[in-house]
Amino acid sequence: MDKILYHYCNTQKMYGIMSGRQLRMSDITKSNDYNEVYMFFPGIIDAMRDAYYKNPFPFEFDGKTNEIGMSMLFQLAYDYFRIEFDKGGVTNFVICFCEEGDKLSQWRGYADNGRGVSIGFSEQELRQYSEKYKDIIAIEKVKYKTAEEINDIIVAKADSLLNELKNLRKWIIDNFHCSDSKQEKYMLLFFIQMLKIVFMKSLQYKNISFQEENEWRMFFKYPITKETEFIYGEDGDKRVIFDEMVEMLKDKIDFNILDNDIVSYFPLDLSDISAKPIKEVISGPNNRILLKDFQLLCGKYKYDDVAFRYSKISYRE
């Protein structure tokens, strides 16, 4: 039997979803869950450093060898990410769902303190959508882990990255046939991109204290670039990797305007999910939408067979 996954939001966003016929995959660093994109930083660099000291292998970077060369590469990567995180340059576009459509913690945290709604979508249809873009977009059930388990994940990913570093220079020489100075540039560039990919893996995890949320996330498999020339420009010569994803984002990024911020997002067309994507809307415990008004809204924007019901939770602000 198909499962319904619920997206909690305020009433204004519900109207935007229905009238614009699109969901918004928004910059996660501007959300309640902004810490998750930093989950593996700087821990993974520290773990790689510790692992290399314990089991060193021949390594060269920028004229320096072994431990000194590796330390130099780690420091450059650390400095890059410290600055980029501060500037909002390392992020992902995410939309969150919950397995339960009438849950107090979700009303409080994600639906305007119960004044909003939850919108039900088919898990199967969301999976089919992500399959159409399987090299770019994923939908995953969040895995809830203890701090110790998250640390073990970081250590395992650090070991994996170190193994990739062993052969990175040879791979660059074989594929780019470039000068020595370009080799160093590519070494740092690809190491940073390798770390970015690993940082995006953190979106699959949350601390076990949030386990009751039963959350699912749809997100991009690779980090979002906020480079203007990639998203809005004509020059693609600088592209090295993630080209297919950059092409999908090109000229599509838009902005949600808050009183004190702008939040970039990727619009996900509901028609690309299903002919009848919205299965149900649940009115929150402090929401005042009446059935007839909701039916008029559905009629105006040509939504058929959308179930509507009220929260059964007794909750007042």
Describe each PLM feature range.
Residues 1-317:
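Partner-binding and oligomerization surfaces adjacent to conserved cores of proteins
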